[in-house]
């Protein structure tokens, strides 16, 4: 009997050891393996011999009033999100990989329940003081107590503790690879500075920081100048070699984009990304373009893309019925807008995983059906029988077929025409809602959309407000419909929970106000499957079907190409990264600059 108990104890102890084997690595990937091997020299998309020097001047729209990117009020200055280095950093030619920056390496349990991060002993803040494990612990606590509520929700129960001067231990409340890696992107604050400042409050002066650039001058609301840190401790790390080549980065603020565009053409700043299709087609002309002083470049995007949508606030009674949301989607004539207003510059959004293999572009396969079938009674039938595609019009400005379909859906939902007005068949209440827009937004498309809705008897009021009012109304969910940018997602990540899970209903990221047990179930499975592509593929596609067929948001468009123009005073590596424009790899070319008109030679 004693022998059997002893053997059982040994077996249990051995199982415990096996269940939490300890691993160590210098680099990590959410899916698969990191692209770059241990002791790699530099990223493939940089020129490690790029010369340092010169200035690049960029533009920003609006104004700024502080230097704290994490403040809960105010407008932080351009580039303030890059003041601080992070424990690990990513590369721009692969999704979801992490390489050492402040950290040197990490050892972790193979079930991702904990990780111990070793800090590089050379890591320094700009005043020369060392970055320590205590600073990492302090930073996490700062975010938990004074940061945005979403951070506290995601990391509730997680602990971060300095267990040695240069070692920090993270214990996760919910073991998971992606949650562990998400904390690798944590910026590290100096405790000695931030212990006397609230993270939620604006800063009138730049904080003590640690990145490759520091703020050296500014005029509040008008311009910011960043200077390269000449003794930057991490300049020669593999992740930084060939990057951060400009001595100075200057941002000039403009209140109006048209004024900014004319300033660019006059040489007041150096580089402009163009989002207005008409501008790109008609205004990038003149002698400076003819003589190639200004380069106009358009490159196809092959990676996951940001997409634009109109979010229905489905907690408003007017949008609680899916048929109403579908009817309004049918009234959005993308083909006409794209041809008449945008010079066919946009592509139509059709997925929350645009340009990735996780987009549901075929009929559901067996693996997806296993996931979806148990929830069939709570799903639109189209999830199982059709491939989602936004309505397509003839592009003539009056698509009778789509409007007839919309009329049928509205009647089925209890909204009937009375004269020229769409009213509720029971209460007589008109079908009316407000479209909330940022004051600075391009709204060429709004009036045609409004006119199309009027043909259905629907009244859409238009209200433009400044950014602070937009933020306040989002936080209080005081809107009917508003535009949203859905950020590119290379794979279905645990970030989805902030945008769609019922637990995060008060998050401003959940613009439609969705609370769905079906979506909660899929997202919980996605979180559990992080790192497992075989499981994530059907889960991502299943979620995509559920979201699109429920019409929580109206698909607008996305940019299939990057449109960029710059004064020809820069050189860049032969290889462009897939997941960014790669401006951080460019350098000032004195020979090119010498050939330009004098007005555009700034930066020498």
Swiss-Prot record:
Keyword Signal appears in the UniProt entry: yes
One Gene Ontology term of the molecular function aspect: peptide transmembrane transporter activity
Gene Ontology cellular component list: ATP-binding cassette (ABC) transporter complex, substrate-binding subunit-containing; membrane; outer membrane-bounded periplasmic space
Annotated InterPro entries: Peptide/Ni-bd (IPR030678), SBP_5 (IPR039424), SBP_5_dom (IPR000914)
Signal peptide feature range: 1-19
GO BP: any one term: microcin transport
Domain of life: Bacteria
Keyword annotations from UniProtKB, A to Z: Signal
Family: To H.influenzae HbpA.
Pfam families for the chain: SBP_bac_5
Name the UniProt record assigns to this protein: Uncharacterized protein YejA
Segments traversing the membrane: none
UniProt entry tagged with the keyword Signal: yes
């Amino acid at each position: 009997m004693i022998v059997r108990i002893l053997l059982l104890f040994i077996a249990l102890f051995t199982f415990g050891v096996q269940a939490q084997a300890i691993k160590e690595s210098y680099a990590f990937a959410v899916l698969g393996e990191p692209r770059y091997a241990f002791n790699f020299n530099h990223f493939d998309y940089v020129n490690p011999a790029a010369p340092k020097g010169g200035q690049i001047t960029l533009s920003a729209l609006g104004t700024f009033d502080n230097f704290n990117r994490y403040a809960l009020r105010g407008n932080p200055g351009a580039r303030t999100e890059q003041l601080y280095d992070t424990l690990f950093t990513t590369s721009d030619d692969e999704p979801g990989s992490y390489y050492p920056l402040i950290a040197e390496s990490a050892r972790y349990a193979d079930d991702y329940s904990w990780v111990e991060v070793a800090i590089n002993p050379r890591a320094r803040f700009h005043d020369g003081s060392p970055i320590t494990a205590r600073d990492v612990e302090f930073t996490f606590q700062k975010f938990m107590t004074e940061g945005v509520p979403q951070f506290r929700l995601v990391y509730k129960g997680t602990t971060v503790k300095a267990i040695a001067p240069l070692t920090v231990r993270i214990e996760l409340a919910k073991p998971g690879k992606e949650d562990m890696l998400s904390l690798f992107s944590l910026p590290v604050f100096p405790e000695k500075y931030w212990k006397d400042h609230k993270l939620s409050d604006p800063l009138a002066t730049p904080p003590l920081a640690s990145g490759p650039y520091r703020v050296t001058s500014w005029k509040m609301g008008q311009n910011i100048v960043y200077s390269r840190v000449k003794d930057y401790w991490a300049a020669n790390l593999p992740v930084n070699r060939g990057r951060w080549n400009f001595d100075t980065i200057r941002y000039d603020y403009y209140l109006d984009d048209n004024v900014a565009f004319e300033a660019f053409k006059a040489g007041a700043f150096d580089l402009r990304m163009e989002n207005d299709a008409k501008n790109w087609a008609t205004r990038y002309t003149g002698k400076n373009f003819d003589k190639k002083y200004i380069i106009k470049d358009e490159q196809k995007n092959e990676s996951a893309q940001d997409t634009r949508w109109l979010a229905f606030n489905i907690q408003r009674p007017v949008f609680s019925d899916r048929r109403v949301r579908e009817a309004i989607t049918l009234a959005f004539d993308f083909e006409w807008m794209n041809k008449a207003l945008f010079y066919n510059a946009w592509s139509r959004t059709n997925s929350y995983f645009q340009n990735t293999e996780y987009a549901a572009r075929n009929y559901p396969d067996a693996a997806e059906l296993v996931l979806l079938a148990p929830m069939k009674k709570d799903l639109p039938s189209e999830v199982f029988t059709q491939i989602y595609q936004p309505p397509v019009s003839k592009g003539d400005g009056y698509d009778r077929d789509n409007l007839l379909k919309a009329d049928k859906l509205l009647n089925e939902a209890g909204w009937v025409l009375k004269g020229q007005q769409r009213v509720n068949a029971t209460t007589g209440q008109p079908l009316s809602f407000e479209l909330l827009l940022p004051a600075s937004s391009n709204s060429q498309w709004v009036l045609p959309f409004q006119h199309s809705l009027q043909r259905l008897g629907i009244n859409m009021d238009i209200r433009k407000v400044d950014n602070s009012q937009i933020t306040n109304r989002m936080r209080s969910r005081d809107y009917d419909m508003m535009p949203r940018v859905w950020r590119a997602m290379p794979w279905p990540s645990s970030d989805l929970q902030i945008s769609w899970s019922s637990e995060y209903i008060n998050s401003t990221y959940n613009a439609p106000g969705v609370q769905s047990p079906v979506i909660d179930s899929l997202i919980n499975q996605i979180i559990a499957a992080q790192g497992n592509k075989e499981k994530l593929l059907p889960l991502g596609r299943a979620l995509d079907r559920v979201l699109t067929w429920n019409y929580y948001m109206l698909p607008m468009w996305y940019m299939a190409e990057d449109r960029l123009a710059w004064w020809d005073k820069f050189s860049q590596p032969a290889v462009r990264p897939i997941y960014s424009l790669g401006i951080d790899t460019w350098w000032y070319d004195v020979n090119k600059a010498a050939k330009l008109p004098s007005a555009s030679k700034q930066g020498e």
